[in-house]
UniProtKB/Swiss-Prot annotation:
Family: Belongs to the bacterial ribosomal protein bL20 family.
UniProt xrefs under Pfam families: Ribosomal_L20
Keyword line: Ribonucleoprotein, Ribosomal protein, RNA-binding, rRNA-binding
GO annotation, cellular component aspect: ribonucleoprotein complex; ribosome
GO terms for biological process, alphabetical: ribosomal large subunit assembly; translation
InterPro entries reported in the protein's UniProt record: Ribosomal_bL20, RIBOSOMAL_L20_CS, Ribosomal_protein_bL20_C
This protein's name: Large ribosomal subunit protein bL20
Recorded GO MF terms: rRNA binding; structural constituent of ribosome
Gene3D superfamilies: 6.10.160.10, Ribosomal protein L20 (1.10.1900.20)
Function field: Binds directly to 23S ribosomal RNA and is necessary for the in vitro assembly process of the 50S ribosomal subunit. It is not involved in the protein synthesizing functions of that subunit.
Top-level taxon of the source organism: Bacteria
Length: 120
C-alpha cells in the first residue's frame, strides 16, 4: 500500500494562513512560513490590543469627566467629585458619566451639584 501524504489538508491549512495574511506587505502575504509567523504575531498584538483598549477608554472617560466637572465648578476636580458621589450614595459608572457630560451637560451639572452637597 502506498504511503499516505497530507497534501490536501496541508494545502488547505496553507491557504487558510495565506488568506489570513491578506493585506500584509512583502513576502509576509504570500510565503507560507513568513505569513504564518506574521499571522501569529498579529494575533498576539490583537490580544494585547483588546486589553489596552479597555484601559485607554477608561482613561478617556476619566479625562472627559474631569473636564466637565471643572467646567461646572472650578474648585472641584475629578477625585473630589468621585468622592462626593460616593458619599452621596450615587453609583453611576464612568462610561455613563462621560456620556452624560458630553450629551447632556445639564444632567451632569445636577450630578456635580449633588456631589458638592455631599462634600459640604
Amino acid at each position: 500500500m502506498p504511503r499516505s501524504r497530507a497534501k490536501v489538508p496541508a494545502h488547505a491549512r496553507h491557504k487558510k494562513i495565506i488568506k489570513q495574511a491578506k493585506g500584509f506587505r512583502g513576502r509576509r502575504k504570500n510565503t507560507f512560513s513568513n505569513a504564518a509567523a506574521a499571522v501569529w504575531k498579529a494575533g498576539e498584538y490583537a490580544y494585547v490590543g483588546r486589553k489596552v483598549k479597555k484601559r485607554s477608554f477608561r482613561s478617556l472617560w476619566i479625562q472627559r469627566i474631569n473636564a466637565a466637572v471643572r467646567i461646572h465648578d472650578e474648585n472641584l476636580n475629578y477625585s473630589t467629585f468621585i468622592n462626593g458621589l460616593t458619599k452621596a450614595g450615587i453609583e453611576v459608572d464612568r462610561k455613563v458619566m462621560a456620556d452624560l457630560a458630553v450629551r447632556e451637560p445639564e444632567a451632569f451639572g445636577a450630578l456635580v451639584a449633588q456631589a458638592k452637597a455631599a462634600l459640604a
